[in-house]
């Protein structure tokens, strides 16, 4: 059951090569801003072999991109579908979407809270 007063934070973790496509996809369903972070992670992909000055070595983490989005509860499903439409390759490493309840948002400059602090001018 969707509650229009509830806010969510979505953390979208995927390959760095998918950032622009994901950013465009979430913008198309009304997301007006996101925080994008470079990260490293490990899981099913188990890292990779790299070389430095001719020497091979094992890297046990992979580069990831994280997009953090604050949104209304009612927008979550649209955002999930938008992300999956551009990021799903049906292979290991496609990433994950984490969704948590967001208790509040406060715009530092104005003191505005809630949905008004998520949307609009920065």
Where on the chain are the PLM-derived regions?
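Single conserved hydrophobic/aromatic residue that forms the stacking wall/gate
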Residues: 1-8
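Compact, glycine-rich, soluble single-domain proteins
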Residues: 37-40, 52, 57-62
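Short proline/glycine- and acidic-rich turn/helix-capping motifs at secondary-structure junctions
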Residues: 39-47, 96-110
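Short, low-order "capping/linker" segments at domain edges
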Residues: 48-53, 106-122
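Mid-chain, well-packed structural core segment of small domains
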Residues: 57-92
